[in-house]
Design a protein with these regions (language model features):
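Periplasmic-binding protein-like
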Residues: 64, 140-147, 214, 218, ...
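Short helix-initiation/N-cap motifs at beta->coil->alpha
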Residues: 83, 98-109, 189-204, 238
Length: 280
């Protein structure tokens, strides 16, 4: 609350000091506004942390077309390696677990609006390190190319003149943007909303290759019993982490410490071996 001190002795110089006073008042107003904004942000973060601790709810944002990390099972229920990790973490923390499917290209809006508490679905940290409050990486990953087994494509060099498809706003798309010398050789680079569609396009011959996560590629090939292969030369190396809204360190710390305790157990259930890296 600004206070004005005016006396008769200053009346004679009031006109001369008006500009300076205006500048000072403006600075004070700006400082007050900045302080209020910071306090508001702190209150929002505290509220978010409170609702996801002490018997609250853990709302996990995920792509429902990203097996084996998150997808719709044969029984119509959401399942996946990442979702089972999240569910077990919530159980151990005494939180109600809720899997919330999201459009992958809207994930930031969902997180910022508070519709979800975290993004947990094969979420690549590389290139996004400063955008979220992250757990430690819990899994290593690569971006690779998938092609038909009987195609003449055996390396990235063979992709010249070919049609390549990638999920919009994915890590594979980001990796391709970092390799303009490679993408310049493609006949066309297409984007799709999900990898199920991409695999159907590949099966039908509408595209020649898909750029995607190696863990998802291997699972898709196995489940479809399809005659596809993964090229040996990878596009990029990266790591998966759980992303929270910037500043939500309390929930991040609770999730991370719990994840370290049980990630290996869930990994062995899904992959018959421990593929996790957290706590190692």
């Amino acid at each position: 609350m600004k206070k004005r001190f005016v006396s008769a002795a200053l009346a004679a110089v009031m006109a001369l000091s008006m500009t300076a006073c205006g500048s000072s008042n403006s600075a004070a107003e700006t400082t007050a506004a900045d302080t209020e904004a910071a306090e508001s942000q702190a209150e929002e973060t505290t509220a978010e942390e409170a609702k996801t601790t002490d018997g609250g709810t853990l709302i996990v944002g995920f792509d429902q077309d990203f097996p084996p990390m998150g997808f719709v099972g044969d029984d119509g229920e959401y399942t996946g390696f990442d979702l089972e990790l999240a569910q077990e973490v919530a159980k151990r923390l005494g939180l109600e677990y809720k899997a919330q499917p999201i459009a992958w290209d809207s994930k930031d809006m969902e997180l910022e609006s508070g519709n979800i508490d975290c993004i947990w679905n094969g979420f690549t940290m590389t290139g996004r390190e400063d955008d979220y409050t992250w757990t430690e990486p819990y899994m290593a990953n690569q971006q690779v190319f998938v092609v038909a087994n009987d195609s003449d494509i055996n390396s990235q060099a063979d992709l010249a003149g070919k049609i390549v498809e990638v999920q919009a706003d994915s890590s594979a798309e980001a990796a391709l943007k970092e390799a303009p010398e490679l993408t310049a050789t493609f006949k066309e680079l297409l984007t799709t909303a999900d990898y199920n569609t991409a695999f159907m396009d590949l099966e039908q011959g509408a595209v020649d290759a898909i750029a995607m996560d190696v863990i998802v590629a291997g699972y898709q090939i196995q489940q479809r019993n399809a005659d596809f292969k993964i090229l040996d030369d990878s596009l990029s190396e990266e790591e998966y982490g759980v992303g929270f809204k910037k500043g939500n360190t309390e929930l991040r710390d609770k999730v991370q410490s719990t994840l370290e305790e049980m990630a290996q157990e869930v990994s062995e259930k899904w992959f018959s071996k421990d593929v996790t890296t957290i706590g190692k």
